[in-house]
């Protein structure tokens, strides 16, 4: 009896509430049937992939972005949102107008489809803005994540 009173007097929540995982997400994917992805985003992702060339010159190390942000079962939309925001940095590479058009199409299209109501509008670090290897990897991860989402909804 004393133990129960002690817990509630000091505002300590029951252990079960502390151990419950946070499952709420502020992102909701709009187009799970894949029409917008297949007809718009995939085409632009493939074009960007061709424009960036081969990744044979890229080192095999994994950037911190991919260690911190994964496309796992509960965070696909959040990953895609962060990756789309990260893509905008590559506009500063100013490769060509066509490159920028495809980049904006993928970035804006992805953010529209994942429909995140994010409270955090942190400025993204610009350390990778001129790294074509990072861009290539980012595009590959975005493509893989979208494919994972679409396969799960079939």
From Swiss-Prot:
Gene Ontology CC annotation, any one: extracellular space
Q: Which UniProt keywords apply?
A: Cytokine, Disulfide bond, Glycoprotein, Growth factor, Secreted, Signal
Q: Name one GO biological process term.
A: cellular response to hypoxia
Q: Note whether Disulfide bond occurs among the keywords.
A: yes
Q: Which residues are glycosylated?
A: 94, 115
Recorded GO MF terms: cytokine activity; growth factor activity; interleukin-7 receptor binding
What does UniProt say on post-translational modification here? Three disulfide bonds are present.
InterPro entries from the UniProt entry: IL-7 (IPR001181), IL-7/IL-9_CS (IPR018049), IL7_sf (IPR038325)
Q: Where is the signal peptide?
A: 1-25
Which SMART domains does this chain map to?
IL7 (SM00127)
Q: Which Pfam families match?
A: IL7 (PF01415)
Disulfide topology? 27-145, 58-133, 71-116
Places the protein is found: Secreted
What family does this belong to?
Answer: Belongs to the IL-7/IL-9 family.
Q: What's the stated role of this polypeptide?
A: Hematopoietic cytokine that plays an essential role in the development, expansion, and survival of naive and memory T-cells and B-cells thereby regulating the number of mature lymphocytes and maintaining lymphoid homeostasis. Mechanistically, exerts its biological effects through a receptor composed of IL7RA subunit and the cytokine receptor common subunit gamma/CSF2RG.
Cross-referenced PANTHER family, in alphabetical order? Answer: INTERLEUKIN-7
Q: How is the subunit organization of this protein annotated in UniProt?
A: Interacts with IL7R and CSF2RG.
Q: What is this protein called?
A: Interleukin-7
What gene name does this entry carry?
Il7
